[in-house]
Amino acid sequence: MKYRSLTEEIKLLELGLPPQEEDGFIGGNLDPKEASLILIPVPWEATVSFGEGTSKAPDNIRLASHQLDVENYHYIKPYKAGISMLEVDKHILKLSNKTRKKALRVIEAIECGESCKKDLKYVNEVSKTINSHVYEAALKRIKKDKFVAVVGGDHSCPLGLIKALDDTSKEDFGILHVDAHHDLREAYEGFTYSHASIFYNVLNECKNVSKLIQVGIRDYSKEEAQRMVNLGDKGDCLYDTAMQAQIATGKSLEEVFTPYIEQLPKNVYISIDIDGLEPLNCPNTGTPVPGGLRYGELEHLIFMVVKSGRKIIGFDLVEVGDSKNGWDANVGARVLYNLCGALLASQGKIEYR
């Protein structure tokens, strides 16, 4: 890929010309050295437990973003701060496909009341390797004073980034997690780094995470619900049914979301599983669930973090599905650009309104 300088990038994006197919996110090809925000694509989905296809999401989102206009209502010209999406690592995609086949054998064995120890060991070892890869990629950029985000892939993908932030942060930080699921299972289906275990692992491996706020949850196990209760002051959850009930009685989004935003510390990491949205906006995500946030509700929730004065230190977008008409990637690209704007605005890199 031939990179552009930030000056060249801004000039080209403001011309509004159709991007070339090989161009990066929003049609950019910014040299990562000049970017404020680095997007790390992670085409990984070995442990998904229902629908497949999210390993294709990073590239699908890149392509779908080519038809986005770069202006944004809340966030003033995010592209001017410099956003660079790294190229998809084809080796990881190939490894994901290979590991997925072994994971399926493990899942099928469980369903038959059997075990498949050799394949399970392989999946867990490779998953650990992926976590290390993401950790090193993120740490390298963080040490160069870049902001970093992950574009998955399944929800196991951002663990390496969160751990890199945990290891480099001088202060505690909270996590705002939007999802249909708690993702608090311990080694779901035997996979230590399952997509359904991301926040179990985060809470056990990251010492500086002081708060976990979850929004949109509507499909969960007894184990997970109890684990959330056991977090005490360290966690809180706005279940989707409770959220919808408040909205139905006439409460504004500000009234509904504020008690949860106020619990977050000044530094916030945002994790967005696209299935936190209503299925209209993510029909091909791996585990869709009826209900969920409307697109505008998610947009407002994120903006409330920014206008509260909190600083977004990183984020991830995961579980975007694959579809022939490109709708899932289209929505994913818009959520991603919104997250980029929110982080940059919260960090004073751009203005917001």
Language-model-detected regions and their locations in the chain:
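Conserved alpha-helical scaffold segments that buttress catalytic/binding sites
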Residues: K2-R353
